[in-house]
């Protein structure tokens, strides 16, 4: 079984490591497991944490839109941009291996940890 975990993240520096560890543990039976997160508008050290994870785990990828709130004040619109990027990533040929998709919302990062 091959899993792709995608999601949007914001201000998750305190919980992202525990969350990834929890997902890794729950999916330890997977033949292949990869992560792709899209970040925007974090006020903490989320980008540093994501970068650290991407260097530590070869199956962890992320991208950042930086600060979208200056030009796009509505959070729902910013989320739509980030989620659409997750969809683009999922649909890319390099991810045709994925059999199952797991979508993680940023608010869950707090509750899973």
Task: Give the residues covered by each predicted segment.
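Acidic donor-diphosphate engagement hotspot in glycosyltransferases and nucleotidyltransferases
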Residues: 112-113
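Short, well-formed alpha-helical segments that are part of the catalytic scaffolds
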Residues: 12-27
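A generic structural motif
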Residues: 28-33, 58
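A conserved acidic beta->alpha catalytic loop
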Residues: 13, 38-49, 67
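Short beta-strand/turn micro-motifs composed of small residues
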Residues: 7-9, 39, 105
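Hydrophobic targeting segments
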Residues: 2-7, 23, 34-37
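Short beta-strand-to-loop acidic/aromatic patch adjacent to the donor-nucleotide binding site
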Residues: 95-109
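Active-site-proximal specificity loops/subdomain of glycosyltransferases
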Residues: 49-98
């Amino acid at each position: 079984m091959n899993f792709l975990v995608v999601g949007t993240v914001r201000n998750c520096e305190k919980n992202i490591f525990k969350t990834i560890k929890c997902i890794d543990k729950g999916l330890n039976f997977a033949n292949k497991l990869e992560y792709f997160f899209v970040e925007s508008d974090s006020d903490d050290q989320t980008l540093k944490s994501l970068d650290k994870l991407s260097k530590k785990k070869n199956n962890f990828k992320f991208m950042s839109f930086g600060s979208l709130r200056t030009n796009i004040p509505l959070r729902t619109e910013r989320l739509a941009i980030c989620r659409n990027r997750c969809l683009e990533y999922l649909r890319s040929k390099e991810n045709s291996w994925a059999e199952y998709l797991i979508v993680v919302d940023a608010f869950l990062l707090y509750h899973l940890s």
